[in-house]
C-alpha cells in the first residue's frame, strides 16, 4: 500500500520524522510536488531568465606564492567587498579527491532509508552527525527540496570513528586539505583591513568546522520548489564543491539573482556573517539560494568554518577605530547560532541580531 502524500501529517512524518527524506518520497514514485513543498510565488526561482554571474571567473591561488601575489589578493578582496562569492582553482585540493567526494555523497544518499535515518538528530549515535531534510521544516511555510548530512569536526580520530562510513575518509581529507587555503584567504582579508590575527584568535574564530553533504533529488516541477531558500551563512568562510548540474544563485547589488556556474575542479568560496561583522561591514556575506532541477539529482559539499560557540564576536577594534563607529554589537557566538538556527531562511535577516542599537 502506497503512502498517502495528500495527507500533510502523513507526508511530514514520512519525509522528516521517519527520515525517508525527499529522496524517499521521489523513490516511492511521486510524480507531482506535494503542497507542503510548493513555495510562495515570491520565493520561486524563474530559471528561464536567469543571469550567469560573470564576476566569478576562477582565481588562480597558485599565483599567491609568486610575483602576482598582490594582484591575486586584490581579486579576493574585491570579491569579498562586493559579491561575497568567488571561485578558486589550484587551491590545494586534488581534482581526484573532489570527484571522489561527489561519488561518496551519492553513495551515502543511495543507502536504504534506515541506514540514513539512524543519524536523525533525535536518535543519532553521535552528536557529531546529523541527517535531515530542509533547514527547520517544523517552522517553514514551505519545506526545502533537500536532504543533507552534517558532520561536525572535533579531531581526526573522532571523525573516522563517528562520521558515516561511506564518506568519512574522503570528507575528512577534503576538510584537512582545504584549511591552509581557508587560512590564507582569511589572512589576506584581515591584512587588507590592517589586522593581524594571532593564532589563538584565528583558532577561536574558526574553531567550529563542519562538512555537509547536500542532496537535491530530481524534482517533477522545479519551478514550484527551492533546494535552499534565501540566506547568508553564519560563519567566517564557506568552501563549496558543487557538481556539474548547477543551481547556486547569488543576489546582486541591484536585487537580481545570478547563477554561479559550475567549473570543473574549482571550489566556490563565500563570505559569512561573521566576517561581515568582524570587518564592520566592509566585507559582504552573500545572500544565496539553490534551485531544483528535473534533469538529475544534484549534490554539493560545503565546509563551514565558524567561531567556537564560546567566542565573543564583534567588529575588530582596529576597524572600528578607522571607521569611527561600530555597526555591530559584541555578542557570544552561541547566541548568534541559537538565533540563526531558530528561524527559517529569510535572506540576511539573521544579521539583524548583531546590529548595533
From Swiss-Prot:
Protein name, entry field: Scopoletin 8-hydroxylase
Residues of the Fe2OG dioxygenase domain: 206-307
Recorded catalytic activity of this chain's protein: scopoletin + 2-oxoglutarate + O2 = fraxetin + succinate + CO2
Pathway membership, UniProt: Phenylpropanoid metabolism
Keywords assigned: Dioxygenase, Iron, Metal-binding, Oxidoreductase
EC number: 1.14.11.60
Induction of synthesis: Strongly induced by iron deficiency, mainly in roots.
InterPro entries: DIOX_N, IPNS-like_FE2OG_OXY, IPNS-like_sf, Oxoglu/Fe-dep_dioxygenase_dom
PROSITE patterns linked: FE2OG_OXY
Positions with a binding annotation for Fe cation: 231, 233, 288
SUPFAM superfamilies the UniProt entry points to: Clavaminate synthase-like (SSF51197)
Free-text comment on the cofactor: Binds 1 Fe(2+) ion per subunit.
Tissue-wise expression: Expressed in both primary and lateral roots under iron-deficient conditions, except in apical root zones, and mostly in the root epidermal layer.
PANTHER family associated with the record: OXIDOREDUCTASE, 2OG-FE II OXYGENASE FAMILY PROTEIN, SCOPOLETIN 8-HYDROXYLASE
Amino acid at each position: 500500500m502506497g503512502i498517502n502524500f495528500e495527507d500533510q501529517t502523513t507526508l511530514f512524518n514520512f519525509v522528516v520524522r521517519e527520515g525517508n527524506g525527499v529522496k524517499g518520497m521521489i523513490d516511492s514514485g511521486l510524480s507531482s510536488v506535494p503542497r507542503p513543498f510548493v513555495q510562495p510565488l515570491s520565493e520561486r526561482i524563474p530559471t528561464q531568465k536567469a543571469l550567469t554571474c560573470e564576476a566569478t571567473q576562477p582565481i588562480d591561488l597558485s599565483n599567491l606564492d609568486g610575483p602576482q601575489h598582490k594582484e591575486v589578493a586584490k581579486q579576493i578582496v574585491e570579491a569579498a567587498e562586493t559579491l561575497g562569492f568567488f571561485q578558486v582553482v589550484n587551491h590545494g585540493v586534488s581534482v581526484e579527491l573532489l570527484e571522489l567526494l561527489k561519488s561518496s555523497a551519492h553513495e551515502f544518499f543511495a543507502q536504504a532509508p534506515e541506514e540514513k535515518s539512524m543519524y536523525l538528530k533525535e536518535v543519532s549515535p553521535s552528536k557529531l552527525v546529523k541527517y535531515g531534510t530542509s533547514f527547520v521544516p517544523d517552522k517553514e511555510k514551505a519545506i526545502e527540496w533537500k536532504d543533507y548530512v552534517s558532520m561536525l569536526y572535533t579531531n581526526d580520530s573522532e571523525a573516522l570513528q563517528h562520521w558515516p562510513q561511506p564518506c568519512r575518509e574522503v570528507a575528512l581529507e577534503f576538510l584537512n586539505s582545504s584549511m591552509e587555503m581557508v587560512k590564507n584567504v582569511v589572512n589576506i582579508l584581515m591584512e587588507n583591513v590592517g589586522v593581524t590575527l594571532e593564532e589563538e584568535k584565528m583558532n577561536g574564530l574558526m574553531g567550529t568546522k563542519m562538512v555537509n553533504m547536500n542532496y537535491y533529488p530530481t524534482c517533477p516541477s522545479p519551478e514550484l520548489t527551492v533546494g535552499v531558500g534565501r540566506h547568508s551563512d553564519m560563519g567566517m568562510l564557506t568552501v563549496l564543491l558543487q557538481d556539474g548540474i548547477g543551481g547556486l544563485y547569488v543576489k546582486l547589488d541591484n536585487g537580481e539573482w545570478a547563477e554561479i556556474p559550475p567549473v570543473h575542479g574549482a571550489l566556490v568560496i563565500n563570505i559569512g556573517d561573521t566576517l561581515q561583522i568582524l570587518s564592520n561591514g566592509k566585507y559582504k556575506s552573500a545572500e544565496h539560494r539553490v534551485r531544483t532541477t528535473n534533469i538529475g539529482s544534484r549534490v554539493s559539499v560545503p565546509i563551514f568554518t565558524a567561531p567556537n560557540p564560546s567566542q565573543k564576536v564583534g567588529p575588530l577594534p582596529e576597524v572600528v577605530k578607522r571607521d569611527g563607529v561600530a555597526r555591530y554589537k559584541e555578542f557570544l557566538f552561541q547566541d548568534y547560532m541559537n538565533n540563526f538556527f531558530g528561524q527559517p531562511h529569510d535572506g540576511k535577516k539573521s544579521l539583524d541580531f548583531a546590529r548595533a542599537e
